[in-house]
Amino acid sequence: MDSANLHQLQDQLQLVGSSSSSSSLDNNSDPSCYGASSAHQWSPGGISLNSVSLSHNYNNEMLNTRAHNNNNNNNTSECMSLSSIHNHSLIQQQDFPLQWPHDQSSYQHHEGLLKIKEELSSSTISDHQEGISKFTDMLNSPVITNYLKINEHKDYTEKLLLKSMSSGFPINGDYGSSLPSSSSSSSPSSQSHRGNFSQIYPSVNISSLSESRKMSMDDMSNISRPFDINMQVFDGRLFEGNVLVPPFNAQEISSLGMSRGSLPSFGLPFHHHLQQTLPHLSSSPTHQMEMFSNEPQTSEGKRHNFLMATKAGENASKKPRVESRSSCPPFKVRKEKLGDRIAALQQLVSPFGKTDTASVLMEAIGYIKFLQSQIETLSVPYMRASRNRPGKASQLVSQSQEGDEEETRDLRSRGLCLVPLSCMTYVTGDGGDGGGGVGTGFWPTPPGFGGGT
C-alpha cells in the first residue's frame, strides 16, 4: 500500500464521517444514502475485528474510492464507503475484541496494526530465508558431506560383503547383526554346510581389528572396512609371490576388493586376489629394487660410491703387479737364456742322450749333491785339527767313519783319482826343495798322516 493512497484514504474517511453526521441531522441527502444511514444506526459498542479482515476491507475501500474519483461522483463514493464500513458489523467474532470509535484515531490505530503485520511477515520471511541459507550451508559443509560419504561407503561395503559371503557360503541372518558366532554355528543349516568348506566364521567385526595407525582420526575414524586385512598393507609393503608391490594409500586399500564387484572369499589367498585386481602394479625391476630401501636415491648413491671405492682399491692393488712385470725382461728373452743354460748343463752332465729339460735338471741336481759330499769327505781330517768346536767335529767324524767306504767306492766309481801324499810334497811342503823350491806348502800336514804311501 503506497503512502499517497493512505493519505487519500484518510481524507475520504474524514469526508465520510462529516457526511454521515450531516445526513442524520438534516435529512437532505440522497435517498439511497439516507436509507443506508437511517436503516443502520451506529452504535458505540465494541465490534470484534481482525487485522486480516480490516486489511481486506481497506483494499475494497481503496478500489471503490479510486473508481469514484475517476467518475467525479462524490456522493456515490460517500455511499459506497458507508456501505463498506457497514460491512464490518457482519464480521465473525475472533480471539481479541477491539473497540471501534468512528474517528480518525481509530483508522490510524488500524494503520499501525497493518504496519506491524507487514513487519512481522517481512521478519518471518527473512528468518525463513536465513534458515534456508543456513541449512544449505550445513548441507554443503565438509562435515555433512563426509558423513554422507561415510554412510554411502558403509552401505556399499555391506552390500559387497553380503554378496561375497552369499557367493562363498550360506549365512544365517544378515550383516546388520554380527556374523554367526559359536552359538549360531550350532544351527542345522550351518552344520549341514560345515563339511563343504574349511572357513572359520569370525565373531567380531574385522574392521575393528584392522584399523591403521597411519590413518588420521579426523578423516577415516568412522569408516568401517571389512576385509582390510592387516598383513603388510599398513606397513607400506605387499608381497605378491616374489614380486614387491609398492605401498598403498588409504583409498587404494579401501578399494582393493571393489574393482571387480566382489571381495575375495575366505578360502582364496590374498595375493591371488591381488593378481586379479591389481595388474597395473607390477613394477619394473629397478623400481622393485628401489622399494627395498626407505630412501632409494640415497641408497643408490651409496651403492655407486661403494662400488667405485672397491674398484679403485682393486686397481691400486693391481698396479704394483703390472709394474713388476714391466720391469722384467720379455718372456722370449728369458726363454732363450734358459735354453742356452740347459744346453750348457747337458754338456756338463751328459744324461746319456736325454735332451728333455726334466732329465737334464735331475742329472744336474744329482751332480751337485755328489760334489757337496766329496767336499765334505775331503775336508774331514782338516776339521779334526780345530778344537774349538768339538761337538761339530765329532759329528763330522762319526759321519765320515760311517760312510767312508761307501764314499770311497762312490768316488772310485765316478773315476776320481786319489794322489799319494809323497807325490804332493809341493803342496804339503814335507819334501826338500823339490817342487819349485817351496819350503812350506799351501796345505798344512794332517796330524794323522805321518808318512807317505
From Swiss-Prot:
Which portions of the sequence form the region Disordered?
A: 1-37, 177-197, 386-411
Q: Which domain of life is it from?
A: Eukaryota
What coarse category fits the chief subcellular location reported for this protein? nucleus
GO molecular-function annotation terms?
A: DNA binding; DNA-binding transcription factor activity; protein dimerization activity
Q: Which UniProt keywords apply?
A: DNA-binding, Nucleus, Transcription, Transcription regulation
- Subcellular location as annotated: Nucleus
Q: Which residues cross the membrane?
A: none
Quaternary structure, from the entry = Homodimer.
Please report the name of this protein according to its UniProt entry: Transcription factor bHLH110
Provenance organism: Arabidopsis thaliana (Mouse-ear cress)
